[in-house]
């Protein structure tokens, strides 16, 4: 009997394996994200985070296992249509935007998952784009070319673009990379607001920095060498023993008013 629509998971991965030539990138990963959950994917460089995201967005075909996003199974559905229901913020999107593209056009393109628009969007689309830019506190940048935006401004514009299609899932891929300390702090404040800006939105935040994990995140997936070391509620997963195994060094984990911090024991 089919599962009721309200209970369909946002993501459901079962024994997912990705290999290219002789290299195994993901090793039998199983993972599930329910509507409204806010996940962190934490892992060192080379752990398989980028390959997992590429698979989730249909750009990397699994070698074996099953992958379902918003009830659609990879290999049985049109992933091009599905991408419109997934908001993606990350370097892969930013790299495709032409320097001359105005911020307003960048956001407007998010409605249909397009980049570098070649014709003027409909008035309703432009109105939505302006509203989202204002919501993200960059309404005054609508006419500014992409190439003239700071890194922090670009991240806000990209989030506005990602929200333009009214997604059920928002993926933030290493979104703090390249930000100076002030811009990073401001960006994390924005991330903290996202659940209120769009209630019910499932969020996947990818990082290898423990200090970027905010209280709004409810769950964590720890990835190392293509395998899941742990996955579940934050309180059950984010523990010194698991993080020591994740990073290959004994670590101390502390949580203060400013958030989490990680120290290598014996430094």
Per-range role (PLM):
Residues 145-149:
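Conserved ABC ATPase signature
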Residues 170-174:
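Catalytic Walker B motif of ABC-type/P-loop ATPase nucleotide-binding domains
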Residues 65-75, 82:
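Conserved ABC transporter NBD signature motif
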Residues 57:
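Helix-to-loop junction immediately C-terminal to a conserved catalytic motif
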Residues 166:
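Conserved catalytic motifs of ABC-family nucleotide-binding domains
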Residues 123-141:
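Conserved ABC ATPase "signature" region
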Residues 220-233:
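H-loop (His-switch) and adjacent beta-strand-loop-beta switch element
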């Amino acid at each position: 009997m089919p599962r009721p629509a309200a209970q369909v998971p946002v993501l459901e991965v079962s024994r997912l394996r990705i290999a290219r030539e002789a290299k195994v990138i993901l090793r039998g990963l199983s993972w599930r994200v329910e509507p409204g959950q806010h996940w962190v994917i934490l892992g060192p460089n080379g752990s398989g985070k980028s390959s997992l995201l590429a698979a989730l967005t249909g750009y990397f075909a699994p070698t074996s296992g099953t992958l379902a996003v918003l009830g659609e199974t990879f290999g049985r559905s049109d992933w091009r249509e599905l991408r419109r229901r997934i908001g993606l913020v990350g370097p892969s999107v930013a790299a495709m935007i032409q320097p001359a593209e105005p911020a307003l056009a960048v956001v407007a393109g998010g409605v249909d998952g397009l980049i570098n628009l070649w014709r003027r969007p409909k008035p309703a689309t432009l109105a939505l784009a302006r509203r989202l830019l204002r919501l993200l506190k960059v309404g005054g940048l609508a006419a500014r070319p992409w190439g003239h935006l700071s890194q922090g401004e670009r991240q806000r514009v990209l989030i506005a673009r990602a929200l333009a299609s009214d997604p059920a899932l928002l993926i933030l891929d290493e979104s703090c990379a390249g930000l100076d300390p002030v811009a990073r702090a401001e960006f994390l404040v924005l991330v903290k607001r996202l659940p209120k800006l769009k209630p019910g939105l499932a969020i996947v935040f990818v990082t290898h920095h423990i200090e970027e994990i905010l209280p709004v995140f409810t769950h964590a997936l720890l990835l190392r060498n293509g395998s899941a070391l742990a996955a579940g509620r934050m309180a059950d997963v984010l523990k010194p023993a698991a993080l020591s195994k994740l990073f290959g060094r004994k670590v101390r984990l502390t949580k203060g008013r400013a958030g989490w911090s990680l120290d290598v024991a014996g430094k």
